[in-house]
Amino acid sequence: MKQPTLIRPRLRHRRSTPAAATKMCPKRHWLVNNRAAGSRGSGGAAARSRRSLDQIVEVLVALIVVNCLATAAAALITPPDSLESLGSLGIPSSSASSSEDDDDMSSGFYRIPHRLEGYPQLQQLQRGQNFKISPKPCSFGRVEGTCMFVWECIKSEGKHVGMCVDSFMFGSCCTHNYTDNIVLPQTAFSYTRPTKPLTLRPRPPAAPYKPMISGMTTIERPHGAGTLVIRPSGPHHQGTLARPHPPPYQSKPTTASDLHGSASHPSSSSSSSSSSNPNSIWHTSTQQQQQQQHQQNQQNHWQMTTEPSFITKPRPTGWTKPGIVNLPMPARPSKPSKPTKKPIVYDRTPPPPPSVPPSTSTSTTSTSLIWPAQTHPPQPHRPTRPQLSPGTSLAASSSSHWPSSTTSTTSSTTSTTTTTTTTRRTTTPTTTTRRTTTNKPTRPYQRPTTATSSSSTSTTSSKTPTTTRPISSSSSSSSGIVTSSQRPTQPTHRTPVLATSGIETNEISDSSIPDAGALGHVKTISAARSECGVPTLARPETRIVGGKSAAFGRWPWQVSVRRTSFFGFSSTHRCGGALINENWIATAGHCVDDLLISQIRIRVGEYDFSHVQEQLPYIERGVAKKVVHPKYSFLTYEYDLALVKLEQPLEFAPHVSPICLPETDSLLIGMNATVTGWGRLSEGGTLPSVLQEVSVPIVSNDNCKSMFMRAGRQEFIPDIFLCAGYETGGQDSCQGDSGGPLQAKSQDGRFFLAGIISWGIGCAEANLPGVCTRISKFTPWILEHVR
């Protein structure tokens, strides 16, 4: 034991290792290596070669194992079933289904504002498994087509006419060589379905023809000045009717049959008529024209559009729009209306009225036409449909009256008076010589809105005062001969209307409401210095139940609240709004609460987002100030109201005008209101480019709560909320409509802002009505800021 310990130190100090020798003597390093190689011999070389071979084999085995593991891991991460179900998302099917269910539950459980960007994007990504372009209509020039993929167009032997866009996908506007899709450019009316003249029909049809067009939307776009192109209607829209303008009246009838066949139905026009009553509102002038044949009036008839035909209606040169004269009157009608639905006419003949001494006579005349009549005995005649003042639901009655005499002989002059007044109850004197019967109207140009009352005559020669019933919300009409020697007196009794031709419409009139006093007369107030609530371009008639594209200029107070994008160079639609004066607009609080003033843009006079060349251009303004209601809650959407002030005041135009505000706090239960906006056509559906409108009834808050309860929801509906919708669903606002107006028509013919669209659960679902902010509760607050 001691010997090794004694020898090792000596060996360590006397002998140096090769490494030490190398450090000490670098020049003799090769000698040390030779000595080490000689000492180890051939056995060391064989060991080194074996170790190198083992290392090479280990590296190769490791590479093979890593490759196998990577392949197995890739197969586990992307199984085939997930590829089929999720496309390129790479999400397992089980997790995808569970997350989709969670998204469905979350989206249907909470209150969701009806603005864009209201839904999570993950749900849309997961539902976009198979990317498809919806077959919506597209047009290039006067060529109609369908949007689809290019390969679909080629496979269906179609013709590519242009490019179309559906969400983020670009497709081909493809047209096919079908008969319904051919539109000849040289014809003004192509492939329309004409109806027979009304003179050849025993009675008008019960309902207009409604073409069912799947996947189409009604788009009424201007196609140049003075021309209106009406496109095919959508799956929930009814057929669009285009009526020709009535020709003016002539001063003399051509034959006696014309006089007796229709009291105010002359052949052609060669006179100028205007309102002579100082209290009348509408002034209409016509140019003098040459007398034409009587049969030309019978050839103008109603025409219906079929897919995808166009109906082009040029405006006559002598036609002027009716002006508005601001006169202090108890009620006023609105603009003339454009018919969209044929009425259903039915006759009722109550018993004849009692005779009254001839000292009673009352009449208000607005238009009087006097011409000599020929010597023919009076015969049963057909009353014409008088041209109505727009907005009035009572039509003027027209009948022919001869002066009182003992025999049915000739008369020197015959006066026919067509009157439209704006009072709810007026007294109509009738000079009678023979009983006549009200038959079907013969002129298709003039259409009443709700009722046409015509006075029938008896064989007595005394004057009979009658009081017409207030059939609709605006006025009643009277006709007769006014004698200047007698002063009108008011009768103390009421007699039924002799013969009434009623027209069934889908509008809720005052007669269908249980008690007009229960609703209360809604008084309106204007926040602007000019007139409010009266559209000047479009002439609305009856409200259409079911969504459809609005006419250009029909809702001139509709605005688009937009958010700037691309560093302020462009803007995108976010919400709707309502113009209340030249400086301020009203919208929902959740539309602008999270935006800076520099991010908000207001566009007024807009109609079609996809077209710039419209009848009148839109106006876009920046925002100088925003005022969100101080009690606004983003959790419950209570007090969801905001005011936005424009940078520069607006100049009102025919397509830009303000809406009235409700002055009285009326519940408005049972009234029909109209929702307008550019929101989605269905929940999660496509966004339209043309302004849409839909009519919905206003329900009470208690009924609204019960509707939510029937749908399995318990919602708190305070009095600052206003519910509108059907129990069965089908018509409602949707994402993108938030902040837009819920407008209703008052008894004076003006539209007022009943509500601002706030929130809803889903879109157009049963027992889930849309909820708006009730503006009547905030009228003082609005006027405080805008005045």
Swiss-Prot record:
Q: What is its main location?
A: membrane
> Where, by residue number, is the active site?
H590, D640, S738
Q: What processing steps or modifications follow its translation?
A: May activate itself by proteolytic cleavage.
Glycoprotein is among the record's keywords = yes
Which CDD domains has this protein been placed in?
A: Tryp_SPc
Q: What induces it?
A: By 20-hydroxyecdysone (20HE).
**What InterPro entries is this protein classified in?**
Peptidase_S1_PA, Peptidase_S1_PA_chymotrypsin, Peptidase_S1A, Trypsin_dom, TRYPSIN_SER
- The coiled-coil segments of this chain are none
Q: Where is this region: Disordered?
A: 1-22, 225-516
Q: Which residues are glycosylated?
A: N177, N672
Compositional bias (Polar residues) at which positions?
Answer: 502-512
Q: Per the UniProt entry, what are the Gene Ontology biological process annotations, in alphabetical order?
A: actin filament bundle assembly; cytoskeleton organization; proteolysis; wing disc development
Positions with biased composition (Low complexity): 262-280, 287-303, 358-368, 393-438, 449-485
Membrane topology term reads: Single-pass type II membrane protein
- Molecular functions (GO terms): serine-type endopeptidase activity
Its keywords, alphabetically, are: Disulfide bond, Glycoprotein, Hydrolase, Membrane, Protease, Serine protease, Signal-anchor, Transmembrane, Transmembrane helix, Zymogen
- In this entry, the parts of the chain located on the Cytoplasmic side of the membrane are 1-58
* Organism superkingdom: Eukaryota
Q: Give me the Extracellular side stretches, as residue ranges.
A: 81-787
Q: What does this protein do?
A: Hormone dependent protease required for epithelial morphogenesis, including the formation of bristles, legs, and wings. Has a dual function, detaches imaginal disk cells from extracellular matrices through its extracellular proteolytic domain and transmits an outside-to-inside signal to its intracellular domain to modify the cytoskeleton during morphogenesis.
Regarding protein family, the annotation reads:
Belongs to the peptidase S1 family.
Q: What is this protein called?
A: Serine proteinase stubble
What is the native source organism of this protein? Drosophila melanogaster (Fruit fly)
